[in-house]
Amino acid sequence: MASIHKDILIDAPAHDVWDAVRDFGAPHRRLVPGFVLDTKLDGEARIVSFANGTVARELLVDCDDTRRRLVYAVISERMKQHSASVQVIAEGEASCRLIWIVDLLPHEIAPYIDGQMDQAALAMQKALARSAKVESGFAADRALSRYRGSK
């Protein structure tokens, strides 16, 4: 099983970021506009239409306002397993961290999902704050960070 971790520092108050994350039916408007084009609620699930043409059914597993943590699972024939959690942690009054973890099978699709998460993180940064930094558990992301730091 592959596990992908994203740690996104956002220059916005945690309560504002959490409000966008927990709005399960509106990621296309509030959280990742441009990356997600449309979302339709279907009971405890949402049907998400992505800009790349992919459509995914995401089942809401848990939404915990106290811990600012949302958990969802993707229901797909392509994947045996896809569970994700998003947690918003305050870093002072004006900034926060968004911790996004995805566990999936088959592990061969991890590079694709990792790339999609990077694109989503950029859309999040644009929507939620003008200045944000993404830290990833993948070596390619660390190399890119080092490259950018050398300029």
Features from the language model and the residues they span:
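Hydrophobic ligand-binding cavity/cleft-lining segments
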Residues: M1-K40, S145-K151
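Beta-strand secondary-structure signal
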Residues: H5-D7, I47, R57, V71, ...
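A short, structured loop/turn motif at beta-sheet edges
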Residues: D11-H15, D62-T66, V88-R97
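Glycine-rich portal/gate segments that line the openings of hydrophobic small-molecule binding cavities
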Residues: G25-R78, S83, Q119, R130-S136, ...
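Beta-strand/loop substructures that line and gate deep hydrophobic ligand-binding cavities in soluble
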Residues: V74-A127, E135-F138
